[in-house]
Amino acid sequence: MTNQTQENGLTAETVLQILREQPNLFQEYQIKTMALFGSTARNQATSTSDLDFLVEFQVDPTLGLYMGLKLFLEQLFQRNVDLVIQSDIKPQIRTNIIQEAIDVA
């Protein structure tokens, strides 16, 4: 972990800790699995980096469920969030995302 990451961006450890302190997150948004990936997972985030999450829902997500989770996370972290539904990952990038993903729960 670099000083730049500590000063300018959230670390993976911080993001995971904050999420794990949300006791009803998985139940409320019907989440089966959730993982952090991207620059924050690699501890290369800056103050302008978004957060990337790989998510699998327990049910087929409605737009309301998807957007509800996205907005909740954006408010929680005060930054843009990209939610990627696991079944929608393009095969060309699936391996890279899965390899760097860090499970939330």
Question: Where are the predicted features?
Answer:
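Short, well-ordered secondary-structure micro-motifs
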Residues: 46-47, 94-96
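Short connector loops at helix/strand junctions that flank enzyme active sites
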Residues: 29, 48-50, 76
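Catalytic metal-binding acidic patch
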Residues: 38, 43-62
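Conserved NTP/Mg2+-binding pocket subregion across the NTase superfamily
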Residues: 96-105
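Metal-dependent nucleotidyltransferase catalytic core
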Residues: 9-10, 18, 57-87, 92
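Basic nucleic-acid-binding interfaces
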Residues: 28, 61, 102
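Helical scaffold of the NTase/Pol beta-like nucleotidyltransferase catalytic core
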Residues: 1-34
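Conserved beta-strand core positions
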Residues: 34, 51-53, 81
